[in-house]
Structures are given as structure tokens and as C-alpha cells.
């Protein structure tokens, strides 16, 4: 392995750890800002849709995934639940569309990224 590729690999690992750390911070913020188990479950579900969507965009090389994208979820966690449902529906629709477009571009061959979703 060349020095340059080793450097890229190490940077990738650090980047993944940073993103995971952001995920944990946001989940803690959601936990502390939520009253009641039912509302908590809905907010965490909404957060996970956003996380999956952002992760898929990164894997598909459509946009560069960065921690600031996840930090935007904090704003969503303070919205009333009726607005959260609206955004969740939009995100799910976009995620399904992105998977379909990627599937069509790849000639209809599923890869491990599609299966993991």
C-alpha cells in the first residue's frame, strides 16, 4: 500500500468516527428534548430516515457527506410532530427515488450498498 493510499484510508476512518460521534450527540439532544416515549420514538425514527438518506447520498457520490448535514437534524428535532411527518414523507420519497435512479444507472444490478438499505 502506498503512503498516499494509506493516508486516504486513515482519513476515511477518522471521518467515519467523527460522523458517528455527531450521530450520538444528536440522538442525545433528541432524548433530552423529548417528553414521552411515543414522541421520542417518532423523533428517533425521523432522525434515522435523515441519517440513512444522507449516508446513501454519500455512498452514491452524489454529494459529499459531512457532519454539518447531520447537525441540521437538531433543527428538525425542535419542530412540532406534524411538520416532522411532512419532512419524513419527503425524505422517504427522495430516498426511494435515489435508490431507483442508482439501480437504473448501474444497469439493474444491485450492489451491497443497495442491499444494506
From Swiss-Prot:
It comes from Saccharomyces cerevisiae (strain ATCC 204508 / S288c). The lineage of its organism: Eukaryota, Fungi, Dikarya, Ascomycota, Saccharomycotina. It comes from the Eukaryota. Partially overlaps TIM13. This is Putative uncharacterized protein YGR182C. Induction: Repressed under low and increased under high copper conditions.
